[in-house]
From Swiss-Prot:
Originating gene: trmB
Name of the featured protein: tRNA (guanine-N(7)-)-methyltransferase
Any GO BP annotation: tRNA methylation
GO molecular function term, any single one: tRNA (guanine(46)-N7)-methyltransferase activity
Pathway where it operates: tRNA modification; N(7)-methylguanine-tRNA biosynthesis
Keyword entries, A-Z: Methyltransferase, S-adenosyl-L-methionine, Transferase, tRNA processing
EC number annotated for this UniProt entry: 2.1.1.33
Length: 322
């Protein structure tokens, strides 16, 4: 199955994701590429563990989905998200048996270390998400990143580093085959939690059809409200940035829709905020369901930014629910 961010719960329950195999081990692979690793690795178990794969490439997502389907691996969920968001928001405490990272982007240029996945904050969250006895597994051809990751794991205070040989399946990935053909080796380490300090999952919420749960406002627009142009507007908070990109008139139902770009750390969402007339003549400003948005502080701020822009056009706010 392919999941959007909005298809998950925060945190989610493995029994909900894998209703037919709820008691099997749960493995997360970060950066699965074209999906070659998991069919090989799953065969080393008596029964295929429940699999969750995260990738940022849409092309890779489709290739891996076909490969896992052809292999008959039905207890697999794939998603296109930043890995940091998935691990922090979706995975419950003490639920994973393994986290697998094969050939991650090393971000080799000077000053780009902050873009690397395997840093102290990630290891601290990973230790919380792994079960006792679980581990994070890294395989990489990049020597400097390997040493960097090992040092970061040790500096996290919650991981022990074990430098061992990689599982054979890790050598079947596209990049492993490339380096093997060139006669080059790979590095592998197991990062084993020494503590499982709880790390909260955060404040994400799925879109709900219940009105009180969806960010909204009720207001009265001026009788002559008929916008002919819209200037891009940027609003910044402590943990988010909202950019109102444009305003569109809707033809079928009347009203308008604002397009907002919302950035919160590693998570970026583009959401629609509708402006529709109600039976009593007031207008409802409300986050639209289109695209499966996740309700976050930044998304609430986007609804607030649209509401405040409308106030600047002469609207009178009757109620704020964001």
């Amino acid at each position: 199955m392919i999941f959007r961010l909005g298809d998950f719960r925060f945190p989610d329950d493995p029994a909900r994701l894998y209703p037919d195999t709820p008691d099997r081990p749960w493995v997360l692979e970060i950066g699965f590429g074209d999906g070659r690793f998991w069919p090989h690795y799953a065969r080393t178990f008596p029964e295929p563990p429940n699999y969750l794969g995260v990738e940022i490439s849409g092309v890779s997502l489709l290739k891996a989905h076909r490969r896992l389907k052809d292999a008959g691996l039905t207890n697999a969920v794939l998603t296109k998200l930043p890995a940091e968001v998935l691990v922090a928001q979706v995975i419950p405490h003490g639920s994973l048996d393994a986290i697998i990272v094969n050939f991650p982007d090393p971000w080799p240029k000077a000053g780009h270390e902050d873009h690397r996945l395997l840093r102290v904050p990630f290891f601290q969250v990973a230790a919380s998400r792994l079960k006792p006895g679980g581990a994070a597994l890294l395989t990489t051809d990049h020597d400097e990143y390997f040493e960097f990751a090992c040092a970061q794991a040790e500096a996290s205070g919650v991981m022990r580093v074990e430098r061992v040989g990689p599982p054979p399946a890790a050598l079947e990935t596209k990049y492993a085959q490339k380096w093997r053909d060139l006669g080059l080796g790979v590095n592998h380490a197991r990062f084993v939690p020494t503590r499982h300090d709880p790390v909260p999952n955060g404040t994400f919420a799925p879109y709900s059809e219940e009105d009180p749960a969806v960010p909204h406002a009720v207001l009265t627009l001026p009788a002559d409200f008929s916008p002919q142009h819209f200037d891009k507007l940027t609003v910044r908070g402590k943990t988010w940035t909202v950019v109102l990109l444009d305003l569109y008139a809707t033809l079928r139902r009347g009203g308008w829709v604002a397009l907002a770009h919302v950035v919160e750390g590693d998570l970026t969402q583009e959401v629609l905020v509708g402006i529709t007339e109600r039976e009593d003549g007031t207008h409802l400003v409300r986050l639209a369901k289109f695209g499966g948005p996740i309700i976050t502080p930044g998304v609430k701020a986007a609804v607030g930014a649209v509401t405040e822009w409308l106030e600047g056009q002469g609207a009178v706010v009757k109620h704020r629910g964001y």
